[in-house]
């Protein structure tokens, strides 16, 4: 089952990315390096509820 998730920047805490994931394949929270427009650099983004 695919679920909608929001990605939050770990440095500025801005929620700038929406995505979806398969909970069966990825039961834990996703952590991806993405571009943060507020910081203007690539930072670690974590999944939020």
UniProtKB/Swiss-Prot annotation:
Range of residues in the leader sequence: none
Annotated InterPro entries: Ribosomal_bL33, Ribosomal_bL33_CS, Ribosomal_bL33_sf, Ribosomal_zn-bd
Swiss-Prot/TrEMBL keywords: Ribonucleoprotein, Ribosomal protein
GO biological process terms on file: translation
GO MF assignments: structural constituent of ribosome
Gene Ontology annotations for the cellular component aspect, listed alphabetically: cytoplasm; ribonucleoprotein complex; ribosome
A Pfam family: Ribosomal_L33
The family this protein is said to belong to: Belongs to the bacterial ribosomal protein bL33 family.
Protein name: Large ribosomal subunit protein bL33A
Organism: Latilactobacillus sakei subsp. sakei (strain 23K)
